[in-house]
Amino acid sequence: MATFTDAEIDELFETSGTVIDSIITAQGKPVETVGRSAIPRGKTKALSSAWEKHGSVQSPASQDTPDRQDRSDKQLSTPEQVTPHDSPPATSTDQPPTQAADEAGDTQLKTGASNSLLSMLDKLSNKSSNAKKGPWSSPQEGHHQRPTQQQGSQPSRGNSQERPQNQVKAAPGSQGTDANIAYHGQWEESQLSAGATHHALRSGQSQDNTPAPVDHVQLPVDFVQAMMSMMEAISQRVSKVDYQLDLVLKQTSSIPMMRSEIQQLKTSVAVMEANLGMMKILDPGCANVSSLSDLRAVARSHPVLVSGPGDPSPYVTQGGEMALNKLSQPVQHPSELIKPAMVSGPDIGVEKDTVRALIMSRPMHPSSSAKLLSKLDAAGSIEEIRKIKRLALNG
């Protein structure tokens, strides 16, 4: 029997406490995701070597327990013993390995190890086996597995030849248990983890992937309806803007036509301005005015009224009388108010002066204007003067 130092014993106590806490917390969890081992890294090798050393000591004691295990198989097969792995009757089946550990305690005390440490390790192995098969096995499968697991909780190199016979007896009708027990190396390694990792159905994904619980799945977006209504409102606004844009395009399509019409109007106004510039409004009383500039110069000269009483002496006659015209203006000579009787009829001289001014203002050839002026001088009647006037206008 190998001896344990104080440091190794403290390390085993610490590891067993961690494993027990992991078992307690892992029993209530559903088998949904693959968890991680609660044992720190680097502890597995030390634990496996400790279990092998402990199992090699208890191998003589385990040979005396086949009859007890057969009796426990019969007791567990009864309906009264079909209970979960954490119920009180299940603890009674865990006592034979403990008693075997107590019997082997005297031998271990000689080498320096404590009996309490070995009994606690046995209890820990029993609890780990119960925790592993509890969540996923049925009651019958649990009863078939307990004797095998109790005996398998003491792995050793010496009793490896006795395992196939006990395994065949312990699991007569459970194929799932046979599949787990057939691989001795995997079953022993899983027991060394002390139940921190539950057995679950193998899935396609690897264990390194991060699990995604259903509770953390994001809920469907609740504002999709608001977004859809907003998009519908935006589409309606866009259609309205498109319709208004069509109306604007229809209105602006007439702008080129309006521009062409405005240009035509400008051209017409320019022609009219040219024609108006060529036309002369002649004053019959001022026939000597032959141009528009002369007419404007005459229009600038206007009489100026001097207010005030003034000096009436020049307008008073010797008899003390003053002669006034139609505008009540004083006249120096009263004879100016008396006009001689005039012969009725048009004045030929005025007509000749008017036609002569018209001929001089017209843009004609000098020879043509000279010919018309000679005819005007020779005219002796109103009819001849009017003919010369028409010739000058048609010019």
Swiss-Prot record:
Bias (Polar residues) ranges: 89-98, 147-178
Highest rank taxon of the organism: Viruses
Region (Disordered): 34-104, 126-179, 192-214
Gene3D superfamilies, per database record: 1.20.5.300
Keyword Phosphoprotein: yes
Key word Metal-binding present: no
Biased composition (Basic and acidic residues): 65-74
Region (Multimerization): 222-285
UniProt keyword terms in alphabetical order: Phosphoprotein, Viral RNA replication
Quaternary state and interactors: Homotetramer. Interacts (via multimerization domain) with polymerase L; this interaction forms the polymerase L-P complex. Interacts (via N-terminus) with N0 (via Ncore); this interaction allows P to chaperon N0 to avoid N polymerization before encapsidation. Interacts (via C-terminus) with N-RNA template; this interaction positions the polymerase on the template for both transcription and replication.
Family to which this protein belongs: Belongs to the rubulavirus/avulavirus P protein family.
Its job: Essential cofactor of the RNA polymerase L that plays a central role in the transcription and replication by forming the polymerase complex with RNA polymerase L and recruiting L to the genomic N-RNA template for RNA synthesis. Also plays a central role in the encapsidation of nascent RNA chains by forming the encapsidation complex with the nucleocapsid protein N (N-P complex). Acts as a chaperone for newly synthesized free N protein, so-called N0, allowing encapsidation of nascent RNA chains during replication.
Entry remark concerning the domains of this protein: The N-terminus consists of a long intrinsically disordered tail. The central part contains the coiled-coil multimerization domain (PMD). Forms a four-stranded coiled coil structure. The C-terminus constitutes the alpha-helical domain that binds to the nucleocapsid (N-RNA complex).
Protein's name in the database: Phosphoprotein
The organism of origin for this protein: Newcastle disease virus (strain Ulster/2C) (NDV)
